[in-house]
Each structure stands twice: as C-alpha cells, then as structure tokens.
Amino acid sequence: MRSKLAATVGAVAVTLVAAAPALGHGRSPDLAFRGQAIVPTGTMFDGTTVGGLSSITYDARRDRYYAISDDQGQLQPARFYTLALAVRDGRLSDADVRLQDVTTLLAPNGLPYPKASLDPEGLVLTKDRKLVYTSEGLPGSGIDPFVRRAALDGSFRGEFPVPEAFRVAGTPASGVRPNLGFESAGVTHDGRYLFTASENALYQDGPAATITNGSPARILRYSLKTGRVDRQYVYVTDKVAEPPVPDTAFSVNGLVELLPLDDDTLIAMERSFSVGAPGTGNTIKLYTVELRGHTAVKTPLLDLDVLGIPLDNVEGMTFGPRLRHGRRSLVLVSDNNFAANQFTQFLLFAVGK
C-alpha cells in the first residue's frame, strides 16, 4: 500500500511517500576496514562518565576529534569530548584513543543545561570553527527539538529555526517522535549547507519503522548563509533488520547520521536494534544518498555485519585525516547508552583506492 502526505514548510512543499526506499545505482566510495578501538563502559575522565557518544566531528586544524555525549544531564551536564585518534598509519587499536578534554555545553542563559531539558545527539564543526549540535527534543515532556551553535568553549552562539512540522504537539500528535528526532548533523565541505534529519517519520507523516516496513524520515538542508531551511527531502529508512525476542520487545531502525560528500550527495548511516536478536542486536548499514528533487535516493554502500566483529550502537561518523598512503580516513563511533553490557567502539576505514 502506498500513502502520500503533503506538508508545506514556508515556501517548501514536500511530498512524503511511505513506501519502499528509493534505491539508486550511483557511484559509491570504496571503503576498507582498518581496525577498531574499544573504550570500556564506566571509563571516567575529568570527573565525567565517558559514553553516549552519538556523533563525532574532525578538526583538521588541530588534528583532533570532538564527540558529543547524549547524557541528558542524568550523570553529568551535557558535554562533548576532545579526543586524539592515532590513525595516520592506517590502523586503529585501543591504545590509539586518547581523551584530552571535556567541555560543558551551555544554554542560551550561559549556564549548563538543566537536567532533562535536551537530548544531545548530532555534532559537526563548521568552517567558521563553530560547533553545530542537535537535540532530539523530549516529546513526552513537551520539549521541542533544536539545532544550535556553540563556540569551542561550549558557549551558546545562536540557533537555527526548526520548521513548525517538527515541533511537538499533543492532540493530534504531530512533530518528532520520542528518541526519533534530530540524530544527525553534517556540513558540506564548501561550508554552504548543513544537513540534519528526523530519525523516523514525524507523527503526521507516517509510521515508525517496524519489522515489516520502513519509515519516511525528513532530511533538512539549511543554508548556512541565511541560517534557514531551504530544502527538505524524503528519506525512507529500511525496516527493522531482525525481529525482537519476544516479538513484543523493543526494536527500532532509524537514520542516525549524515555525512555530505558534496551539495547533493551524502553518506547516510542507519542503525537497527532489536532486543533478543543475535549477537549485540545491532545492524549498521551505510548508504550513498543522492538528493533528487525532494527525494533521497539510496545506494547500498556497506553492511557492517561483513566485518565479522561485535557491533555496538554505532551512531556517529566523520571523515578524518589522510592516511599514510594518501587515502582519506572515515571514523565511526558508538553510543553505548552507558550500559554495562555495551561498549564505546571506534571503527576506522580507508576511503578510495
């Protein structure tokens, strides 16, 4: 069955199609796996609990990475970590990860965010050396998602307007679903555009992903010149990869990261999890995405199951430095949910031949 919903945001008309994903045959980059590093759950740094790393971005000037924690202030205030990853030799192991700093994100009033006032998820460094970070919002508490800017010291530096369709409303339900809002953040190399997306469909756009159907998420493209959304795209996720056990247990699949290759081409990451599924229950897939009209057309790039290693809840992705033989690096990171049976995982890939 095929259903169409029309939504207008400002002057932008978007047709949302709850159907099979739009699959393309575009040219995708070659990826070669070069190793992993594990940071155990419970690791402490400078008085904070290291974990929940849901997004990562690379600072080429400093050869450092920034990774945001999705702690809502339950353990410590909202924050991001500065890390060094020794990857230029084309390998990654546990000893190659060094935590260097932790920075508290500050609310517009200049103070740390109050507990349970945001759900920090996406993070990206822009050309003007500001950070953009996203919050999924907390629909159960009536808190809207947001997209904000911060200086590298964590201080508030502005906010991008969020289209009304994403805002939380109760009757009838509309806007982002709980834990299915703005999980991603990516900026084009030329600094013109910022991308983020809902992880699944907005309430008014269709169902969340299940073991039988995908979900029509919305990708937003912001012009960094105007600070406003100038285009929206429909991205239909895959269905949940594995049935949960029992079949009434929790399961999810969603669009968790976007990494621009150019103005119209992205790498998208989907993460599926099912309670009771084999192994860790996680399935992570990468797609090359071409933006055509208002549709995101997916081409399979990599199913991380082929790596043959246990996968945690991988949600973050960034390009890093050139490796020793000239290939560009790609780094992925997992959000361990601060759970004792999970782990923070960094994965290294070489891009190109």
Q: Which positions does each model-derived feature cover?
A:
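Secretory targeting and sorting signals
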Residues: M1-G24
